[in-house]
Swiss-Prot record:
Protein family membership: Belongs to the MurCDEF family.
GO CC, alphabetical: cytoplasm
Keyword hit for Phosphoprotein: no
Primary location: cytoplasm
InterPro entries membership: Mur-like_cat_sf (IPR036565), Mur_ligase_C (IPR004101), Mur_ligase_C_dom_sf (IPR036615), Mur_ligase_cen (IPR013221), Mur_ligase_N (IPR000713), MurCDEF_pg_biosynth (IPR050061), UDP-N-AcMur_Ala_ligase_MurC (IPR005758)
GO molecular function, one term: UDP-N-acetylmuramate-L-alanine ligase activity
Job description of the protein: Cell wall formation.
Keywords: ATP-binding, Cell cycle, Cell division, Cell shape, Cell wall biogenesis/degradation, Cytoplasm, Ligase, Nucleotide-binding, Peptidoglycan synthesis
Protein name: UDP-N-acetylmuramate--L-alanine ligase
Residues the record lists as binding ATP: 110-116
Length: 443
């Protein structure tokens, strides 16, 4: 009889992806979480995975229990019950570290761009050969016959340390998660420790001098735009249809590629994927063919059009990510006003990066701010308010609420870019409803 996996916190992006993957491999899967809607639960519901409210009644000794990394006995009754009874359980990252040993594994790490790059690598490889994958947008695919496993490696609290992949990409490093990391050097040390566990090939963005300090027992290949790299993206053309470029390895052209994505960061992400697959011996013609059909990942520059109004939803919640997202919007919509609607995520990050957020958001033409979304791990002690950020932004800025997003209507020929890692989608939904009601009233 097949074992049943129970996920404590199944709506988490990594947890939901892992649950879907195990479900597709034929295992019995269930999980528990809060009632509040989260975008990952749609895939779980479509797959028929049972989602329960948190309760000790969900727990029995015969379950294989996987606990989300954020949960502790003092904030989750199920985990408290598991520990009280002495039942065996694994944290998400511990389970994943053991699970991936049955495959040739390809990890994607980095402060920014992990999910998009993991999604692109998984998309290309699964269209060439049977591949399992786990992406941080809540998407997972499991196949018992797969030789390869593509996964996202998260640096927060050094969760990627149980992983020993054959290959890994490191897109960049940056100071983030100030509730855990003490500074950039601490972040670097975490990535350096992870890099030492990579077995066959490490692919690193080559235009960050700090990344050149990373060491690994695996061969290191640098990628980027400059000629000093091993893999170089050249002859770049950025249009409203995406980006075209050639990639050179050791000064020899290995292919011409098109990726239907926007922003310089997505050219770099694609170059990293190309480099990894080239070193693995994958046919570059096949790689080029399947790069063209990549449709993106959830909450990464996700677009919709409502009555000729363009709305973009993006997970960007760090200044570097905001700049990249706004750059992508300008590439695709060069003649439109770029309106940013941003919700800061966590008080600790907002305090630590306040000036950087102001600089990044000033790349938009107009800015609207939502109230700071606090993490369950922290308390609002009044040290920072969203008004503090608004005061530092040089462009026009204003505050909006879920109940009143009408100030957004004060723009013509605009693209609305909603960004954040909290519940910014509630603001987006309110704006969509407002647009729909306006359309009805004018018909």
């Amino acid at each position: 009889m097949s074992k049943t996996y129970h996920f404590i916190g199944i709506k988490g992006s990594g947890m939901s992806a892992l649950a879907l993957m195990l479900h597709q491999m034929g295992h019995n899967v269930q999980g528990s979480d809060v009632d509040k809607y989260y975008f990952t639960q749609r895939g779980l519901e479509q797959a028929g995975v049972t989602i329960l409210p948190f309760s000790p009644n969900n727990i029995s000794e015969d379950l294989e229990i996987i606990a989300g990394n954020a949960f502790r006995p003092d904030n989750n009754e199920e985990l408290a019950y598991v520990i009280e009874k002495g039942y065996h359980f694994k944290r998400y990252h511990e389970f994943l570290g053991d699970f991936m040993r049955q495959f040739t594994s390809l990890g994607v790490a980095g402060a920014h761009g992990k999910t998009s790059t993991t999604g692109l690598l998984a998309h290309v490889l699964k269209n060439i050969t049977d591949t399992s994958f786990l992406i941080g947008d809540g998407t997972g695919r499991g196949s018992a016959n797969a030789n390869y496993f593509v996964f996202e490696a998260d640096e927060y609290e050094r969760h990627f340390m149980p992983y020993h992949p054959e290959y890994s990409i490191i897109t960049n490093i940056d100071f983030d998660h100030p509730d855990y990391f003490t500074g950039l050097e601490d972040v670097f040390n975490a990535f350096n420790d992870y890099a030492k566990q990579v077995q066959k090939g490490l692919f690193i963005y080559g235009e960050d001098s700090k990344l050149h300090e990373i060491t690994s027992k695996a061969p290191i290949y640098y990628y980027g735009f400059e000629d000093s790299n091993d893999f170089i993206a050249k002859d770049i053309t950025r249009t409203v249809n995406g980006s075209d470029f050639k990639v050179f390895y050791n000064q020899e052209e290995i292919g011409q590629f098109h990726v239907p994505a926007y922003g310089k960061h997505n050219i770099l992400n694609a170059t990293a994927v190309i480099a990894n697959l080239y070193i693995m011996g994958i046919d570059m013609a096949l790689v080029a063919e399947h790069l063209k059909t990549f449709s993106g990942v959830k909450r990464r520059f996700t677009e919709k059009i409502i009555d000729d109004t363009v709305i973009i939803d993006d997970f960007a919640h760090h200044p570097t990510e905001i700049i990249a997202t706004l750059d992508a919007a300008r590439q695709k919509y060069p003649s439109k006003e770029i309106v940013a609607i941003f919700q800061p995520h966590t008080f600790t990050r907002t305090i630590a990066l306040l000036d950087d957020f102001a600089h990044a958001l000033s790349q938009a033409d107009s800015v609207y701010l939502a109230q700071i979304y606090g993490s369950a791990r922290e308390v609002d002690n009044g040290e920072v308010k969203v008004e503090d950020l608004a005061a530092k932004i040089v462009k026009h800025s204003d505050l909006v609420t879920v109940e009143n997003v009408s100030p957004l209507l004060n723009h013509d020929n605009a693209v609305y870019v909603f960004m954040g890692a909290g519940d910014i989608q509630l603001y987006e939904r309110s704006f969509e409803e407002l647009l729909a009601n306006l359309t009805k009233n004018t018909q």
